[in-house]
Each structure stands twice: as C-alpha cells, then as structure tokens.
Amino acid sequence: MRLNLETERLILRNLTPEDYRAAFLWCGDPDVARYMVYPVYTKAEDVRTWIETLDPDDPDEYDAGIVLKSTGELIGSGGIYYRPDDDLWTIGYNLRKDQWGNGYAVEMIRALLKYAGRTREIRGIQGTFADANNRSRRVMEKLGMTFAEDVTLTKLDGSASYPGKRYRRIFR
C-alpha cells in the first residue's frame, strides 16, 4: 500500500531504491539480523535489490520505511501484512541497533493498524519472535498481544533455526 503517514515522532513512507545505503545499516548488522528471517546482508546493493521487490500497490502489504521526524533519518522498516489463510495481519519490524528501546516499532504498528483499519477490517494481528529476543516479546506485549503457540523459526537460506513464539491479539 502506498504510504505517507506521520505519528508524533515518525514519518512512515514507502522505501525507495535510493534508501538502500541507509537500510544496509540495519540489514547488514549481524545483531539486527540475528533473529530476522533474512541472513545478514553483506553487500548494500543486495539491499537495493530487496527494496525493488516491494510492491507499494499491494493492498495486503503495508510496508513502511521508518523515518525520524526530528532528523529525517531512515532508521528502520516494518509493516503489517494480511494473511488470508488465518484472516489475520502479521506484523514485522526491524530497526537500527542504536534506535532500539525507543518505542518506535510499537508506534509504527499502531499507526499502520489505524490507517489500514479505515478501509479494511482487521480481525486481529500476529507476530513471531525468537525465544531469546526479549525486545520483540515486549513490543508484542505493548501491542496487547499474548502467547498463541510455540514455533520453530528458520532463516530463508536455511542457515539457522531457533525456537520461537507466536503471539496474537484478536480484535473482533
């Protein structure tokens, strides 16, 4: 979905291929990528290729670049993604490590849910995180999500698997 939203502290907008160098700061950081499904990016140009695959016209995917309103810096990305198989929206987010712990992921997800909820029915949300990723657990708890099931998470390239949790919140 095409985005241009503002919250108290953030601008949420679609990523563009020109954002690849800024996005490499989190996509190429092993600490950020540790529990993400993608392996750590080793070349900034590969981040550009990923950004080019995003479809801003897909009505089931609200992908957002997270920009600090105060500085104009692109500090992360994330979104909400409709999954018809369970009629829930999956949440996702990742931020530069120096921006962790500021509540930006929660602020972004709340804004996207409010925006999407104007034209779409949102029955509920879900998200997964690695057991060892307490920061993501806290994000989901702050969004009112609770434990739904244990899961095994595997990197897209198969390089690692780890135990995780799925959290959900049903609105209707």
PLM feature spans:
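Acyl-donor (CoA/ACP) binding surface of acyl/acetyltransferases
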Residues: M1-R34, V67-R172
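Conserved GNAT-fold acetyl-CoA-binding loop/helix
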Residues: D31-T53
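A short helix-loop-beta-strand connector motif used in the catalytic cores of GNAT acetyltransferases and
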Residues: E52-G65
